[in-house]
Structure formats: C-alpha cells, structure tokens
Amino acid sequence: MNKVRINILSPGRFHVCDLARELDKNGFDVKFYSFVPTKRAMKFGLPKHCSASIFFLMFPFLGICKLFSRSFKLRRLRINVQDYVTGFIMRRADVMIAMSGDFVYAPKKAKQKGSLIIYERGSKHILEQRRVLESIPYFSKSKPVPDINVVRELKSYQLADYIAIPSKHVYESFMEHTYPKERLFVNPYGVDLSDFYPIRDMEKRYDVIMVGGWSYRKGCDLIIEAIRLTGLSFLHVGGLVDIPFPEEKGFTHVGIVDQKQLVHYYNQAKIFLLPSREEGLAMVQAQAIACNLPLVGSSDSGAEDLQQMVELPEFITIIENYTADAVVSALHTAMMNYEQLQGRIYAGNAIKELTWEAYGKRYATFLNRIITEKKM
C-alpha cells in the first residue's frame, strides 16, 4: 500500500518542521519545502529524507533581504519568489500543508492537481488580528498589518479545504468572521520534553521570567509597569522589538539564546509571565509548564487552552484585562501558587498531551479522517 504523500511548505522552520518530523513517524511520506538548510533542519530531528530545502535557490534573495532588512518590499518579493519557486519544483501530493499568507500560487497549483489544501494559521483571523493590533496606541500612526498581508491571508482562507489553528480564541475569531467551522482543525502546539524540564535545586535568581520578542503585541509595556509596582525581580530572554528595555534595578535582559539553553533560564525563575494581546498559542508557555513554572497568561495567548491540558489548572492564571493592575493581581496569585507547589509537578501525567508526539498523533488522526472522507 502506497503511503499518503504530504508536502509541507514554510519560509522557515517554525512549528511545521516539528509537524513534518512527527507525520513521518506516523507513517506518511513527507517532504518539507523551506529555505532552512537540510543540516539545520536535521538538528531539530527532521529526517534527511524529509527535507526538500530550497536554500540555494533562495540564497540570493535571502542575502539581499538581510542586507536591506528594513525593506518591506524586498520581504514581499522574497515571499512571492519562494511561493513561485516552490510551486514549480514541488512534487505531486495527496495533501499540501502551507503557512498562511506565505503561499498562494503553490497551493493553488497543488489543488488543481487534486491535493487537499490545509493552511497553518498561528494567529487570529487576519481581520481580527489587524483590529487588535491597530487598537494599540503605539501603532496608531502606522499599519501593523499591511494591506497586502490581509489580501494574501484572505486568499488563503478561500483556497483552503481546512485551516489548522492552535487555540480556542483563534477558533472564535474565525467564527466572528463567519468562516465555516467544519473547515477548522484546532490542535495545540507541543513541546520537546527532552529540552524542557524542571532542574531541582537550581537557584531561583529571579521571581519572574518572560521569553520571546520584547514588544507591545506581547504586552511588554504592561510587564514593565507591573514589575515596577510589585518590586519583583524580572528576567527577559529574547530579542528587543519595539519597546526599549528598562535599564534599572530589578530588570535583566538576555538576548536570543539557543533553544537547548533555554531550560537553564526558565529554571532560574519562579513564575512565567506573558500578557500577550494577540498570539495564537505561544509555545514558550508550554515550555514554561514543562519546566514546572506557574504561568500567568492571557485569554489571547492560548493559556486558557493549556489550562485544559494540565492536571492542576489552578497553577495557570489568566489576567482579567490588559491593565498593569490586572497583571499585578495575577502575579500575586502566581507567586502564591509557586509557594504551594512544594515539589509537585502541576502538569502531572497530562504533560504527555503537550508533547510534539501528541500533537503529531492528533494531526495524523485528522489527516486519515479527511483523506477517507475525500475518497467516499
């Protein structure tokens, strides 16, 4: 019996590299088309036979984009070129999985040849995402979501047979824009438990940690206010995006580090904080849970979904609104939760549902169902 052929299209690694690896384990014939070099993809567990890297074909465009990193037009050119290049070289497949907004030509071509088209959408419906971001005062005089991005996203939604999304609030945003619910597949992202785990007896040098881009989108302006109000010690690990990092007592910044080093930073803190205003399901939250840090998240960070995936959901606190006072209140709750942990692993055996293996099995079950339905 021939294996089901699946092409996965992505500009970079993202979570779909993990998806490609897991679908290969589940018996599918997978090809991962991206500009990630094969050797780098293999470092994240992708088998060599799954990689269909177009790095060398894209190298001139990647180089130009790096030289002129602030040019939006060049970034759009790179996206369009990759879309067409992938469309020309990709093999025929039963299913194509593509990152939304990045690919339109290639999926359209694949659909003409009989492929089922699944788009991966990591954030809210593009119109809702634009509304949320435009409501942030910092973006009042700019366009946080360019019109061309909206156009390509909406084309993706029309072209899709299904859209895979990571959380309840993303699902609700599509419902608000009357997207057919039977074409939505909710599947929370996973975490690699070999990279993230509690380290016993490690000194807790910080009260609070946040990992990820330092930005208004992730609520970092609220973090600054809340840390000043509470006097807690704070560690940030990641890049600086659109908010200056405070150079004052109580605030420590570390730049971007290799994923395998992150566990040592998580374990130096007591609790994890992410009051994100708009994010599908921030994977750093699952990483923090795997390290057994009580979590403070938002209704728009995917934290509510994670509450349903641990044995002791009370150790995940959701901020009531996007104000510094609400973050302060949630921090107090989380700090009390930390004191009550007393060595317990609050995810319990349910941590298995937060792994990439579980994510891949849920996806495999979904694929087998829709492929069977197509044949009927």
Specify the residue positions occupied by each region the protein language model found:
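Acceptor-binding helix/loop patch of EC 2.4 sugar-transfer enzymes
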Residues: 61-73, 116-151
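Membrane-proximal helix-turn-helix segments that form the acceptor-binding/catalytic region
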Residues: 83-92, 104-106, 125, 139-163
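Short alpha-helical donor nucleotide-sugar binding micro-motif in glycosyltransferases
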Residues: 157, 264-269
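Conserved donor-binding/catalytic core segment of Leloir-type glycosyltransferases
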Residues: 192, 199-218, 224-229, 235
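Aromatic "clamp/platform" in nucleotide-sugar-dependent glycosyltransferases that forms part
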Residues: 277
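Short hydrophobic beta-strand element within catalytic cores of glycosyltransferases
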Residues: 294-299
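A charged, aromatic-enriched C-terminal amphipathic alpha-helix characteristic of glycosyltransferases
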Residues: 339-370
